[in-house]
Amino acid sequence: MQRWTVSEINQEQTHMPSVFDTRADSILSQLRDSGQFKLLQMIEGPMDASVRIRGYGDCLCFCSNNYLGLANHAEVVEAGIRGLRDFGAGTASVRFICGTFTPHEVLEKTIARMMGTESSYTFVSAWTAAEALFPTLCEPGDTIISDELNHACLIDAIRLATTIKKGVHKAVYKNNVLEGEKSLRAALEAARANKEATGQIWVVTDGVFSMEGSIADLPAMRKMCDEYNALLVVDDSHGHGVMGKLGRGTHEHFGMVDALDTPARSGAANRIDLFTGTLGKALGGGAGGFIAASKRATDLIIQRGRPTLFSNALPCTVACSANKAIEIMLREPQRVQRLKDNVAYARQQIGAAGFDVLKSPTAICPIIVHDTAKAIAMSKRLLELGVFVIGFGYPVVPEGHARLRVQISAAHTNQHIDQLVDALKKL
């Protein structure tokens, strides 16, 4: 057997680039040449209305999911510090072995109370929550019907479910906001007519669509789901802290949940059947996601969900911070109202400046510029002017629909918004 020295191996490798290396270099070159290469901006302090960015100094932040301004709230930070001191840095296990701590129990009760559900269960991310939901709860013969504009975590979770469990069917309907009820009803009719689809029908939607800022027509969807004996699943990651008087979500906005602390009625006609959501946006905990649903659903997730069985629990420090953030949101409805006032002012001022901003009551204010390279160039120029806004283009949004996504926070003031508009006028 021939023996190779390290220098001979290194020399051999320098003349034999892998297929991956060649392919990756080609893709990255195309992204750079087209102006679509994304640069990571290094933030050198806490998240707030203004952030310190390496190379740019202090900039107004209009691209954060920190909708209620809780990411650096003193009580939220202190709760995390106490959690770190009391429970340590890591859980060192999955939940069913020795990774379930009292902060998990407290947080999950708080989430269920907020959402108006029987139960909830937490994960290290909302992506993981979605990944646990469909492959665990769906069985062959089921049909999953998904909005075309749903978040990538839902899309990939549905793909995973249909791959793992052969015989799970999927369908996509035109966006509920743009196309109304016709496309969804057609998908429901097709599912009912499919002789191989004899199981449960699941209708899946974002509550607030992350790129459009629009909201799903949940009352109409609930009515259709009842007609076809379908379950309604809502990912409300951009609705928590934003929609409804208390910030409980899009279902509260539509009056589809009882007052806080009213006992949950499993299967009631005005309910959303299952939620997925995040703790890393308005709810200020820094990371983590959850499923909120009936106890039978969360019990099945605990018993059979692969992300539950084979992935570590949410760190206790994050659970403590998130619990405090929800507590603050529910006790301070004026914080949610301030966000709504800021959103209304921002949309009015941006529109008055001549920009095409999509209309919505949510904190996401997309300014349509159509071309991806243009959106990225505008984002760069805004940063030079001291305003942090991100440009989004293909493949995050369809070709020709590139945009600047302005995101408003309760931490912003009218003066901050005026500075944003002044910078936009200079583009």
Predicted region positions:
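Active-site PLP attachment segment
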Residues: 246, 250-300
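Active-site phosphate-binding strand-loop segment of PLP-dependent enzymes
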Residues: 66, 168-234
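Conserved PLP-binding catalytic core of the aspartate aminotransferase-like
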Residues: 337-344, 351-386, 396, 400-401, ...
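PLP-dependent aminotransferase class I/II
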Residues: 283-350, 355-358
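PLP-dependent enzyme catalytic core of the Aspartate aminotransferase-like
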Residues: 1-4, 8-13, 74, 78-82, ...
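N-terminal "arm"/small-domain region of PLP-dependent enzymes with the aminotransferase-like
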Residues: 22-89, 230
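Conserved N-terminal alpha-helix of the aminotransferase class I/II PLP-enzyme fold
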Residues: 78-125
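Conserved PLP-anchoring active-site segment centered on the Schiff-base-forming lysine
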Residues: 133-152
